[in-house]
Amino acid sequence: MTIYEKNIQTLSKYYPGMDYNIDKAKHDLKENYTIIEEKSKDGMPVLKVKKDGHCCYLGGKRNAQKPTEEWLKAQGDLCDGYTYIMLGIGNIGYLRELIEHVDFRLNIIIYEPSIQIFLKSLEWIDLEKGMKKHLIIFWVEGIGLMTLDRIGSVLDKVMRLENLNKVQLFILPNYDILFEKKCESLVKKCEDTAFENRVNYNTAVKFSNIDSINVMKNAKYLCTAYKTIQLYKTIPFDTTGIVVAAGPS
């Protein structure tokens, strides 16, 4: 079994139906660029993308491994629940560093705009260990119902206000050039999510005292309110009554 086949099985285990959605996406593929696999001078696989007459490398042609190692060292002290929102998986070295060298359980959300790049990356890394160790979500444009417009539900869960100081958005090299609009859109979605959570928190704090005061002021009406007294004496005190009601009242 190849690494690619093993990864498809692993993904299907955690996300049922992923294998079917990947096969369908491959069949319906309509991407207007070419993916070329090369080797860097240090022997690591590197992707070159040809798009609109231009070529971009997603990893270093001379030394592909060292930049990812230095990146991990620069991350400092991580902790359980730290979240990476990554744009791209074209340089698999960044994900590999997190899987192999971070023992804390991380949340790793990877948005990949290209099906071709995603499928090629599945040939280079065994995901089984990483999926057991961390929460890894692949959000690949065009596979199943996954689109950038629908990633908000994922961002809402990992970008709660109490976790914002443990969230990092990381855009892999040259993705801002190859997928400029997707990059700008993801950045804006993250900013909007963080802002909305902050506003909701501030609103809750500001009105928490007012809510308490309102409850105390209106407590005296509970005993005489219509909904409180409408069943009074309707059911005899010495009889068991069953009230069937719909709604919070």
Segments and roles (model prediction):
Residues 1-242, 248-249:
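N-terminal donor/sugar-recognition subdomains of glycan-related enzymes
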